[in-house]
Regions:
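Bacterial N-terminal signal peptides that target proteins for export
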Residues: 1-6
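Hydrophobic h-region of N-terminal signal peptides that target proteins for export
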Residues: 10-18
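Propeptide-to-catalytic entry region of secreted or membrane-anchored zinc metalloproteases
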Residues: 20-114, 124-126, 234, 241
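The catalytic-center signature of Zn2+-dependent metalloproteases
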Residues: 24, 148-213
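Active-site-proximal segment of zinc-dependent metalloprotease catalytic domains
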Residues: 28, 106-174
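Structural recognition of the beta-strand scaffold that forms the well-ordered cores
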Residues: 38, 78, 119-122, 139-140, ...
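Short, polar loop/linker segments at the starts of domains and inter-domain junctions
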Residues: 48-57, 132-137, 190-201
């Protein structure tokens, strides 16, 4: 009986550390849209360089990422999902114990690199949960583990992904345990100063556009009968976590 009570107490405590991310408040017109190219590294004979994440996992992960970043009025649609082998597996074998993680850049396949978009690479294992090396080099391991905090996220990978994207928006670590930029916790919140800083940084990146501009361009293409081109733009904004006429129209036309 005593052990059962302890188990139930531990379970209740565990559940109390997890909470659904609150719904974002910004209106549609406030959103800035920053496309992401996701790379799933799957390398034959290299278990550490082979993620077991699938497309359905990425969909779930980025739904949570966007619920976090929605509080800053920033949306991060997965523009492209690529499954590919690491470019240089030897870089892992030679450097996996190194504290300098820039060697991870050597894993990026040359054919899928691009200056536009954010690039997030998923693999199985390396020394930390995730690392931001540049807009075109963010790395997250699918075995990430975090320290639970009150009202924190229920899953590590979306939180680690959102954290590294925070660095892409120039945010630094802030060791308030419930904060997104704290190290190693399940916290996901942003304060007003961080939101302002992230939006200012996003506004300076030429390939990040306001949602309203994307919708206007998509509507124009749709009116011209260019349904395929319009659908690509509608998909970019359809996942914004709002129930409004703009997202409803985008969702309806995104599959055409």
């Amino acid at each position: 009986m005593h052990s059962r009570c302890l188990f139930l107490a531990a379970l209740i405590c565990s559940l109390s550390l997890r909470a659904e991310i609150k719904a974002p408040q910004p209106e549609f017109k406030e959103y800035l849209v920053a496309p992401v190219r996701v790379h799933l590294l799957v390398t034959k004979g290299e278990l550490n360089l082979t993620t077991t994440l699938e497309e359905k996992d990425i969909t779930r992960i980025f739904e949570k990422v966007n619920r976090i970043w929605g509080h800053a009025g920033i949306h991060l649609p997965v523009e492209q999902l690529i499954k590919e082998p690491a470019e240089n597996p030897n870089a892992y074998r030679q450097n996996y114990q190194s504290r300098n993680l820039r060697w991870l850049l050597a894993l990026r396949p040359k054919t899928s690199r691009a200056d536009s978009w954010f690039h997030v690479y998923y693999l199985k294992r390396f020394g930390v949960n995730g690392v931001y090396i540049g807009r075109n080099g963010m790395f997250v391991k699918d075995t990430a583990r975090l320290r639970g905090v009150k009202d924190g996220m229920d899953e590590p990978i979306p939180r680690v992904t959102a954290h590294e994207l925070g660095h892409a928006f120039t945010l630094k670590h802030r060791q308030s345990v419930t904060n997104l930029m704290a190290s190693g916790t399940s916290g996901w919140t942003l304060n007003e100063a961080e939101i302002k800083q992230a939006r200012t940084a996003a506004g300076k990146i030429k390939w990040i556009s306001p949602a309203g501009e994307i919708l206007k361009e998509a509507d124009a293409l749709h009116k011209q009968g260019k349904k395929k081109e319009a659908a690509a733009l509608y998909r970019r904004i359809a996942g914004i976590p709002l129930h409004c006429p703009e997202t409803a129209r985008a969702k309806k036309r995104a599959d055409r």
